[in-house]
């Protein structure tokens, strides 16, 4: 009872400070408001590069999204993103009877608020062709008012080339989203033509809640940049279960020289990216390996357990110094078989004394459609 009374006494000044009374019969319940704060996504530098959190595929009411552009900026700030692109559809604008659709307008409305929020705003559009070939995102674009709205197949190439003529970074979107249409998930002639013409620079390997594994192989085999995006139309909070610590919108991790649009573009051109979707990472092996190595550290053995039969087991602490999530399955050696590294957390693993290393597959990663990152943990 004493503890309850103490708690009650402590609450009295808290409630008094949360409520504002203007002395004229009005009480403001400020304690019921959502706190104004920005998440801080912790990912250490990788090989000297900053890891920037970027979403280059989102929508607003200026195409088929459900929100005004400023909401996208607010969400990006709250969720700890570094860079954002509004990529409203060029050829598909179902709200045009209610909204004065202009292809540059969503970006224009955000320029000042993004600067104030310290969000790097990248200009972009979604070139929305029929499937196949499907949709292409163009970012780092110029004036989009002259982009092609005609969706006929004869205009497919020219629609993309208008963005290419502006030196845009172009990536192919969500290939498996219409599996019932023949050619929707194939490397078709038009895509080969764009690729050879250097008008295709990346592929969206993860779109929202779907991983397109064949697209990862294409990126690796053809030297294209691995991309991941939310493709958000609704509110992020309506789509993602943010009650789980590891859940967040799908995004591209960009390993950039600094936090500027120019550095992001250079990194995209160089292919220094990893796709991130809550528990899962996908990318070229060199980048996924470097990211894992920057985040995960195995400490020297801190304890040797001596069994009744005289056998000795060494214990180690393995730490995850990031907000990423890793699952490991033992492949070679005699030691702890399954390890889950939660964000900013550590686990204990063990191995018989004398064991020099353990080899794990990081099953929460993909470096090809059928391959997880393999890591060797040296034991000291």
Annotated model-derived regions:
Residues 1-5:
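Positively charged n-region of N-terminal signal peptides that target proteins for export
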Residues 8-17:
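Hydrophobic h-region of N-terminal signal peptides that target proteins for export
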Residues 12-13, 67, 98, 241:
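Alpha-helical transmembrane segments and their juxtamembrane interfaces
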């Amino acid at each position: 009872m004493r503890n309850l009374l103490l708690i009650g006494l402590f609450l009295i000044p808290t409630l008094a400070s949360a409520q504002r009374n203007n002395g004229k019969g009005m009480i403001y319940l400020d304690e019921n408001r959502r706190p104004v704060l920005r998440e801080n996504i912790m990912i250490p530098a990788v090989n000297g590069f900053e890891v920037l959190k970027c979403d280059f595929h989102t929508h607003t009411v200026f195409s088929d999204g459900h929100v005004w552009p400023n909401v996208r900026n607010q969400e990006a700030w709250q969720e700890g993103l570094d860079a954002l692109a509004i990529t409203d559809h060029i050829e598909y604008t179902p709200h045009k009877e209610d909204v004065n659709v202009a292809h540059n307008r969503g970006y224009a409305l955000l320029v000042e608020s993004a600067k104030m929020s310290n969000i790097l705003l990248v200009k972009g559009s979604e070139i929305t062709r029929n499937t196949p070939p499907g949709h292409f995102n163009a970012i780092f674009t110029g004036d989009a008012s002259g982009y092609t709205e005609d969706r006929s197949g004869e205009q497919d190439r020219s629609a993309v080339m208008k963005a290419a003529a502006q030196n845009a970074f172009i990536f192919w979107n969500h290939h498996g989203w219409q599996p019932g249409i023949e050619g929707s998930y194939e490397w078709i002639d038009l895509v080969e033509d764009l690729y050879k013409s250097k008008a295709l620079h990346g592929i969206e390997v993860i779109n929202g809640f779907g991983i397109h594994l064949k697209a990862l192989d294409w990126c690796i085999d053809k030297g294209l940049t691995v991309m991941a995006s939310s493709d958000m139309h609704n509110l992020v909070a309506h789509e993602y279960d943010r009650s789980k610590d590891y859940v967040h919108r799908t995004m591209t991790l960009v390993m950039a020289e600094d936090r500027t649009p120019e550095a992001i573009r250079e990194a995209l051109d160089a292919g220094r990216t990893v796709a991130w979707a809550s528990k899962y990472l996908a990318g070229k092996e060199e980048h996924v390996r470097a990211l894992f190595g920057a985040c995960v550290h195995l400490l020297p053995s801190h304890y040797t357990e001596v069994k009744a039969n005289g056998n000795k087991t060494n214990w180690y602490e393995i730490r995850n110094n990031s907000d990423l999530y890793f699952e490991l399955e033992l492949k070679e050696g005699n030691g702890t078989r399954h390890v889950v590294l939660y964000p900013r957390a550590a686990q204990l693993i063990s191995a018989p004394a004398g064991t020099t290393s353990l080899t794990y597959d990081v099953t929460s990663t993909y470096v090809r459609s059928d391959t997880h990152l393999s890591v060797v943990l040296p034991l000291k």
